[in-house]
Amino acid sequence: PLEVAEIKARFNMDKPVWVQYFFWLRGIFQGDFGWSGVSAAPVSEVFPNKLAATMELALSAGIVALFLGISLGTYAGARLNRLPDHITRIISVSGASLPNFWFGILLLIVFWANLGIAPIGRSDAMLFGSIAHPTGLYTVDALLAGNLKAFWDAIWHLILPAITLGFGATAIIARMMRSALVEELQQDYVDAARAKGLAERIVLKRHA
């Protein structure tokens, strides 16, 4: 009980909620973001160490969103009102409406619990134990160390989180790409290219 009371007093948890909020807000402006129970250290000390990994995940999600969004949008726009277009519309609506956390759980159920092909949790700590972390990016640090096993392990652990975070942006990019391509394919210069006898593949790549 004495230790509990001491901890409550240290973190102002023995005071009313509005007073706790005031202390928290004041701490934010002073650079004190609180205490991390997971890392057992101040958040201000943990944050810089985790920032690189967070940026790595965000960048990976952006790459996934761009690749899938542009690919799906182009494929659907070139096949207007056909099955690929309808499937892309469903994906776009799902991406715009499904919460990320729910979609992430769905991916875990399918690819980890049922199929067993996707890992969960952190990258294997044993692979990274002897690797220096000059950048803090697991994939980059593994490559710099010449440890391909660690590199692929990091990539493998990034796949599901990157898809989960990038799904919403994928839907938006796919819809924008589809709309832009459909509009371009209705232009006169595209009709002229088709009239010249160019293959649809060439029309899409060079003229649309």
Predicted segments, located by residue:
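Hydrophobic alpha-helical transmembrane segments of membrane transport/permease proteins
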Residues: 1-22, 111-150
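Hydrophobic alpha-helical transmembrane segments
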Residues: 2-12, 103-113, 160-162, 205-208
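Hydrophobic alpha-helical segments of integral membrane proteins
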Residues: 3, 7, 17-33, 43, ...
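An internal, D/E-rich "acidic patch" concept
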Residues: 13-70
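Alpha-helical transmembrane segments and their helix-entry boundary regions
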Residues: 16, 85, 101, 117-120, ...
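Short, hydrophobic secondary-structure boundary micro-motifs
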Residues: 19, 34-37, 103-104, 119-121, ...
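Alpha-helical transmembrane segments of integral membrane proteins
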Residues: 51-84, 113, 131-208
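Cytoplasmic-entry segments and transmembrane alpha-helices of multi-pass inner-membrane transporters
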Residues: 71-107
